[in-house]
Curated annotation (Swiss-Prot):
The keyword Zinc applies. Disulfide bonds join 238-240, 271-274. This is 33 kDa chaperonin. It comes from Clostridium botulinum (strain Eklund 17B / Type B). GO terms for biological process: protein refolding. PANTHER family: 33 KDA CHAPERONIN. It comes from the Bacteria.
């Protein structure tokens, strides 16, 4: 089944919904970083949140970066997304292992930790990016984003993010949704939506059963005039390039470049997001040095 993100409304626009199946892109990210099951679940939840939230950006050059680090053994996760539903991410320690939690599930909250902040950074092409932050609520990620939307953006929200890791470490199912009540929605509607969300099986169960994201949302919002606005296929996509890495290397300054050149060895730089290796020979470093002197 292809991954898909859809945006929708219910009850004449009183409820705003972004939902998606992200199994393939989470599998891609997990493979790139060689994640353990709990690392795959944590990274996958963040990637899913990123691609869902990224679709709310208006322009192609706008970017959304999400960061969470609660002091746990996962050592933090960062993801970056764009409005075309592309997303990339990395986890500080992809080899983290934890015992199952008291519910018999992967202990994502324990791996992330609670002693830290969740950051939402929106680069909208202005002089300064918008930076929102909240204390980590549970480390389970979905609850943390629900807390962020409610506290930082004053939008009561329900967030579900799920990743089901198979025995062979591939991703069996991944997906999620963000449901937000508009300011003029009445309390009875909010109570009904909350009740529905509490009664449904985990989203990974529904995906594993072969249900599409449309079927899942129609199941949740039955009788609420679900209106699907648009859809897009999300992708794990890194936009690194040799040119960008070269610019970053040049920016470290003439003295540091001279030290690398004097060392007489090739310099290898690895992209955090996709593990692509870029090698710069002493000749390459020499050219960068000469360019820096010209400037």
């Amino acid at each position: 089944m292809k991954d898909k993100i859809i945006r929708a409304t219910a009850k004449n626009g009183m409820v705003r919904i972004i939902g998606g199946i992200t199994t393939n892109l989470v599998n891609e990210g997990s493979k790139i970083h060689q994640c353990t099951p709990v690392a795959a679940a944590a990274l996958g939840r963040m990637l899913t949140a990123g691609t869902l939230m990224g679709t709310t950006l208006k322009g192609e050059k706008e970017a959304l970066t999400l960061k969470i680090n609660g002091g746990g053994e996962a050592k933090g996760i960062t993801v970056t997304a764009h409005n075309d539903a592309s997303v990339k991410g990395f986890i500080g320690n992809p080899y983290v292992t934890r015992e199952l939690n008291d519910k018999g599930k992967l202990d994502v909250g324990g791996a992330i930790g609670k002693d830290g902040l969740l950051y939402v950074i929106k680069d909208l092409g202005l002089k300064e990016p918008y930076v929102g932050q909240v204390p980590i609520y549970s480390g389970e990620i979905a609850e943390d984003f629900a807390y962020y939307f409610t506290v930082s953006e004053q939008t009561p929200s329900a967030v579900s993010l799920g990743v089901l890791v198979d025995k062979n470490l591939s991703i069996k199912a991944a997906g999620g949704f963000i449901v937000q009540m508009m300011p003029d929605a009445d309390e009875l509607l909010a109570d009904l939506v909350t009740y529905r969300l509490e009664e449904i099986p985990p989203i990974t169960t529904l995906i594993s059963e072969g249900k599409s994201i449309e079927e899942i949302l129609e199941f949740i919002f039955e009788g609420m005039d679900l209106n699907i606005l648009d859809s897009i296929e999300p992708k794990y996509k890194c936009d690194c390039s040799r040119e960008k890495v070269e610019k970053a290397l040049a920016s470290i300054g003439k003295n540091e470049l001279q030290e690398i050149y004097d060392d007489g060895k090739n310099e290898e730089i690895v992209c955090n997001f996709c593990n692509t290796k870029y090698t710069f020979t002493t000749n390459d470093i020499d050219k960068l040095l000469k360019n820096s002197i010209k400037k």
